[in-house]
Amino acid sequence: MIWVPSTSAQQEFLPSPPADHSLIYVLDQQNKLISLPFETATTPLRAEQVARSTSTSYLELKGEHSATVLLATQRIFLFTIDRGGAHPPLLVWLTPHRGARRVPAIAQRGIAGFAISSSEIVRPIPRGLAKNGDEVFMELRPRVSLMPGEYAIIGNDLTRVATFRVIAAAD
């Protein structure tokens, strides 16, 4: 007699790409993609202009906490462009500051836009799931479970910052 283990219980569910490519999604407990709400970040940096000198400042989101609460292991999905010079939105750790949430940002001399301080970036394991031309539907999974705290997924558009918080699991 030969016993063949079932692989269906061991396989991870991979969602199909949703119709709206502009949103950022998480997978709920019923394996449905739920979109994260966006907030608007502000910064004293003039991100639309070429910086005359390198300066460090911040991106700020109003309010002490995000309204969205996720589990530390919740899976994040989004669409991004796959071509040289483009990077997917960044998953970053936010710190509280006088009733708001902030992340350090840098404007580099001679370049328009901003960069996030590398110490605040949560290094993900990107996993491409579907490709259509230059566009890729991907999963961003942190390398380790997220610690309790405030997080944001930040791309180039400061009016479209997805935020969430992770709270400590109840024992």
Regions found by a protein language model. Name each.
Residues 10-112, 155-171:
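Primarily secretory-pathway and cell-envelope proteins
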Residues 1-3:
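Bacterial N-terminal signal peptides
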Residues 142-150:
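A glycine-anchored, Pro-Gly-centered beta-turn/N-cap motif
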Residues 5-9:
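Sec/Tat signal peptide C-region and signal peptidase I cleavage site
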Residues 106-135:
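Extended, solvent-exposed segments with strong compositional bias
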Residues 72, 131-133, 146:
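Surface-exposed coil/turn segments at beta-strand junctions on protein surfaces, enriched
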